[in-house]
């Protein structure tokens, strides 16, 4: 059964009772959220003058920043000490991370008045003595440095404030009520010990439990996030709490929420748009020009605009590798507004080139204010400008030999700053168990409920063992923490409705249910949470794909077109066979994939480069290279490649890699080329061809480019295709899945390459022969029986057609060849199959979404097949 009253309501009645007795009280709660809720109950229901109600941390809010060293300054002081210790080398980034650990350890030693020499004898191993000497050196040097500043550390300052508050309470003789569950720490421990005679405890009751608890195991964390969003959507009128202490998971959940929410966890300031903006600016200042870094900045939601999108389109594909901002101004601008935007951008970002950290930070602030004049009014702006100002003040402590390392340092420092997003009107709140356990909600969602995220197991100290921490008396993970999460869980179960979720898989690992839940299952039957989430979330998306989209009897989705293109390439035919929807998107919708700015050069880019090199070498062979020796021919081939690379915009490392690969196979290719030329009377390179067909009354032209066509002295013809990637198997060729060279063979026998010398070959007998569903037609008026084939074959006795795929690699074997001989029957079968394929699509114009045999599919995301695989 559900608790009739919440903890805070019961506590409010207790307070009223104490006040009626004339007892003056000061109330301390675990956090400010509970304080606000309690004040609201007391004012709304009892309309009394409120007693002092504060969170425990409020004791430390009376601060004068001039009295203590800021956290940033203390980190840099420790970082400098750590890097000076030569026995253990640290770079700046490592030293800052170590400084964060040592800062807490050293302050704990000071507060507890503990001598670090206590741990010297704890372990005599060489490893431990090495660690101890490092700790002792850093601790003693840190104490001296802090003393010279004549200030306290922030931790010591907080401890002094605590002592002042304890003295005040003793003088006033107030009764202190500690209400709720407090996480133990050194301050709270001291507070309870010093004021044990002044403190009254008000603890929650665990006697009730909801009768509306359900459980679900989504397949992965994204489906878990979708379920959370769906639950929130179904319960818009309810107060909902999503309980988690994991910021990464919270970010995933929030990405799916459509409604406003309050966030008690807070975000790293670097994860906000404004933090990402500063990070991106610093990366640009500290690194060589890089389009990826530039657009990492420009795509920030705070400054992204139509001009950015147009500039990105201009720089896609071949322009995506430009290596200097000056090349931006050499682009052909169709829009004067875009050109002006580009000029201003270069002036703002690339005019200055500072080298010391102070100048980098000042320039970062100036650039940010130019790009976004109201930047400090954005979410987290006030906190960020304060952080930036402090960092500039202490930047003299940052000694970097290479400024390229600074973006990581800045990001690390920024990650220590929290920003909170709280919306009073929101019905959804996200927080940790300790924030929400004592409140009441209509619905509690406990996501990713497993031992990894629902336990108090403390992470081991990176420098000290548990035993060493116990010797120093600074091990706070005592017995009380083992019951904390059990208490939180029991309190949360008192709400009206609870949904427990646990994704089966997260970060590639299987996730087991939490022990707390397993114990609950031993006592009660927990029903499975059921919701028709697929239908609710995804049906509208599928229906909105296209008004022509329709389900088929075999449960395949198809799209219908009103037209079919009249000009196709041989690669289009392969796409139509392997991926019908990809064909529809490319040829009918006119969608073409752009190579994004951040994309590295692809295998196909390397293939295009090699084709250009071989084409130029082959076409100029008779004029320039035929009489050269092997070494000079190889040098000529490599030189062609170097000249092409010189005039091509590519990253320097890519050019070097491609030069190495070209050099590796160049000698083998020259020998391969020489050997094949010996038996050839004519060779054609990069020659265009076409095949004309009439399909269901529509004229179709198929076009293609043959890499190389050889005519031997015996009138044998070979069509070759160079491949730097995967070559098709013989089965794929025979079954028509890779029809490129087959279609080029059909072009050849029907004079589709329009080469006059082909008329002198026996293939001229093919010129007036067309295939049509089992019969041969010599002309449009004469139908011939298939027996004509036997007569035709006898006249073809001296003509042989071979197709060959030549695989070129930069490792041995450098050249591999797959050859397939074709005869008239084989070509006839393939042409009949091609006609049938085209007849189906020309007639029906129906293209399947889920039929896909492609190794690479640029249009997969358009099919929205992820909805179907949910």
Swiss-Prot record:
InterPro entries from the UniProt entry: P-loop_NTPase, PDDEXK-like_dom_sf, PDDEXK_AddAB-type
The protein's name: Uncharacterized protein RP403
SUPFAM superfamilies xref list: P-loop containing nucleoside triphosphate hydrolases (SSF52540)
Superkingdom of the source species: Bacteria
One Pfam entry name: PDDEXK_1
Source organism: Rickettsia prowazekii (strain Madrid E)
């Amino acid at each position: 059964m559900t608790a009739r009253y919440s903890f805070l309501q019961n506590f409010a009645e207790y307070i009223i009772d104490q006040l009626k007795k004339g007892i003056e009280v000061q109330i301390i709660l675990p956090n400010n959220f509970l304080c606000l809720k309690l004040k609201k109950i007391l004012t709304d229901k009892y309309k009394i003058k409120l007693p002092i109600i504060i969170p425990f941390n409020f004791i430390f809010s009376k601060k004068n920043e001039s009295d203590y060293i800021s956290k940033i300054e203390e980190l840099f002081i420790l970082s400098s000490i750590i890097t000076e210790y030569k026995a253990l080398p640290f770079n700046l980034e490592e030293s800052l991370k170590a400084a964060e650990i040592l800062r807490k350890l050293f302050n704990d030693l000071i507060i507890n008045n503990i001598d670090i020499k206590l741990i010297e004898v704890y372990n005599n191993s060489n490893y431990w003595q090495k660690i101890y000497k490092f700790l002792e050196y850093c601790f003693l040097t840190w104490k001296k440095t802090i003393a010279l500043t004549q200030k306290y550390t922030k931790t010591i300052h907080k401890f002094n404030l605590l002592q002042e508050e304890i003295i005040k309470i003793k003088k006033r003789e107030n009764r202190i009520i500690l209400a709720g569950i407090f996480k133990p720490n050194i301050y709270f421990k001291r507070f309870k010990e010093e004021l044990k005679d002044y403190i009254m405890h008000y603890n929650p009751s665990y006697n009730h439990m909801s009768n509306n608890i359900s459980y679900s195991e989504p397949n992965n964390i994204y489906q878990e996030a979708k379920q959370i969003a769906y639950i929130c959507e179904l319960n818009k009128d309810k107060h909902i709490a999503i309980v988690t202490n994991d910021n990464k998971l919270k970010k995933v959940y929030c990405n799916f929420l459509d409604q406003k929410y309050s966030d008690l966890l807070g975000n790293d300031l670097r994860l906000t748009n404004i933090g990402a903006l500063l990070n991106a600016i610093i990366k640009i200042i500290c690194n060589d020009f890089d389009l990826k870094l530039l657009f990492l900045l420009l795509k920030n939601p705070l400054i992204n605009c139509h001009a950015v999108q147009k500039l990105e389109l201009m720089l896609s594909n071949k322009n995506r590798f430009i290596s200097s901002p000056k090349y931006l101004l050499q682009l052909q601008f169709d829009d004067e507004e875009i050109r002006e935007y580009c000029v201003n951008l270069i002036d703002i970002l690339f005019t200055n080139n500072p080298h010391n950290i102070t100048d980098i930070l000042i320039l970062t602030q100036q650039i940010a204010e130019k790009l976004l004049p109201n930047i400090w009014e954005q979410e987290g702006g006030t906190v960020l400008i304060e952080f930036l100002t402090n960092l500039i003040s202490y930047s003299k402590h940052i000694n970097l030999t290479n400024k390229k390392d600074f973006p990581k340092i800045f990001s690390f420092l920024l990650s220590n700053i929290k920003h909170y997003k709280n919306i009073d009107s929101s019905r959804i709140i996200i927080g940790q168990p300790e924030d929400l356990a004592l409140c009441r909600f209509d619905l509690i969602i406990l996501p990713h409920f497993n031992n990894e995220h629902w336990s108090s197991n403390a992470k081991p100290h990176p420098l000290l063992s548990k035993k060493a921490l116990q010797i120093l008396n600074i091990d706070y993970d005592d017995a009380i923490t083992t019951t904390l999460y059990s208490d939180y869980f029991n309190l949360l179960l008192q709400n009206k409705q609870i949904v427990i979720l646990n994704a089966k898989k997260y970060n590639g690992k299987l996730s087991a249910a939490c022990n707390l839940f397993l114990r609950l299952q031993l006592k009660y039957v927990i029903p499975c949470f059921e919701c028709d989430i697929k239908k609710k979330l995804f049906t509208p998306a599928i229906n909105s794909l296209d008004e022509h989209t329709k389900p088929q009897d075999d449960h395949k989705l198809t799209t219908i077109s009103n037209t079919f293109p009249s000009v196709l390439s041989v690669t289009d035919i392969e796409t139509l066979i392997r991926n019908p929807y990809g064909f529809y998107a490319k040829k009918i919708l006119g969608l073409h994939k752009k190579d994004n700015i951040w994309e590295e050069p692809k295998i196909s880019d390397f293939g295009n480069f090699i084709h250009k090199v071989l084409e130029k070498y082959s076409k100029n062979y008779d004029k320039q290279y035929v009489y050269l020796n092997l070494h000079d021919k190889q040098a000529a081939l490599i030189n062609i490649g170097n000249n092409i690379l010189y005039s091509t915009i590519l990253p320097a490392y890519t050019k070097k890699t491609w030069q190495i690969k070209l050099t590796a196979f160049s000698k083998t290719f020259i020998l391969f080329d020489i050997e094949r030329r010996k038996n050839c009377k004519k060779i054609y390179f990069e020659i265009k061809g076409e095949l004309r067909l009439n399909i269901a009354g529509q004229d179709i032209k198929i076009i293609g480019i043959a890499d190389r066509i050889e005519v031997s002295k015996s009138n044998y013809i070979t069509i070759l295709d160079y491949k730097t990637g995967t070559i098709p198997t013989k089965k794929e060729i025979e079954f028509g899945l890779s029809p490129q060279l087959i279609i080029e063979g059909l072009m050849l026998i029907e004079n589709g390459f329009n080469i006059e010398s082909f008329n002198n070959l026996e293939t001229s007998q093919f010129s007036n022969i067309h295939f049509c569903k089992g019969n041969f037609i010599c002309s449009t008026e004469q139908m011939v029986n298939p027996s004509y084939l036997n007569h035709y074959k006898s006249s073809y006795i001296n003509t042989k057609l071979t197709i060959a795929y030549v695989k070129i690699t930069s490792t041995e074997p450098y050249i591999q060849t797959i050859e397939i001989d074709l005869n008239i029957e084989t070509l006839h079968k393939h042409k009949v199959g091609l006609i049938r394929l085209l007849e189906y699509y020309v007639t029906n114009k129906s293209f399947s979404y889920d039929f896909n045999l492609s190794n690479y599919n640029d249009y997969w995301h358009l099919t929205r097949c992820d909805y179907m695989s949910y």
